Amino acid sequence: AEFSRDVAKSSVDDPLNARYTPFDGKPAFLQAAANWYRNVHGVELDWRSQLFAVEGAVDGLAGLFAILIDRGDAVAFADPYYPSYHCMSVMHGAEEILLPARAELGWLPDLDAVDESVWRRLRMLILNYPNNPTGAQAPASFFEHAVELAKRYGFLIVHDFAYTGLGVSDQQVSLLTVPGASDVSVEVGSLSKMYAMAGWRAGFVTGNRDVVARLKQYHYQMGSMVTGMIQDAGAVALNSDQSCVDELARRYAGRREIVAGGLRSLGFDVFDSAGGIYVWFKAPEGWSGQRFADALLDVAQVAGPPGTCFGHGGKDWVRLSLLKDESLLREAVRRISAAEL
């Protein structure tokens, strides 16, 4: 948001921002995050004990793996998945359990189909909605079921909430809206997508007090604090009326219609996503996602990663980004049409 840039520019002149800021996060930033949860999601948080500032969602996820996962611990997440979940699992020697997400279920995993033995040995369940790469959104009932399972079997839920705000507003569900969710879960938030601050590196981890306290202790020794002027800018964004987020969501909705609608008119099977910043579509009959993505690049000069970049579950699919402006997206659809693949 432009007003965040203005705040950051003025904050450069604050001599306090040239010093180490509080490692937990500046109080104004943490209070703003708590205000955002209250105003947007109706969730009450104690900013002192339930919020911790991190340098983006990946920083928060990496810290959670470091404090929670030992070699051999079981970590589960849906397939397709954001690649960092797999990489962090491998780096920590975790047992990786992939939960198949299927198109007919709206690209959500069927939690009832998971064998009880998996739940009994599980240490961490990672959820990510709105989802990367599919754009899927999870209803409140899905989160309620996940929380019930976590309470019954004693595992922790980590919800990667990086894409919140960029979809249909009444479907943007925070896991923490579920009663008792903070007993068994943490949510990782990011300012990167909803405020177009990807390069600024600011976010937060919130929820379970014990986990947040452990993450703070880890970060004191192995991490650093978020730059002061970035926290100042982030606090203003979080405390704003969120009209900038609504405008960005409308812009992405328009771009989504250009790409998804264009692909459908060409006969492609496109997932009807209402969130995120990507379009997830199936390669034509007889093509793998990898082969079709290669052909798109070679013939149409349109770049989009094949679904196999996000796990075996995406092997027949391709992801296209909506980050470019409308004219370039229309040109991409035109090129795909002209390629006649």
Language model features with spans:
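Conserved glycine-rich beta-strand-loop-beta hairpin in the small C-terminal domain of fold type I
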Residues: 235, 252-260, 270-282, 314
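N-terminal small-domain helix-loop-helix segment of the aminotransferase-like
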Residues: 1-56, 63, 237-240, 341
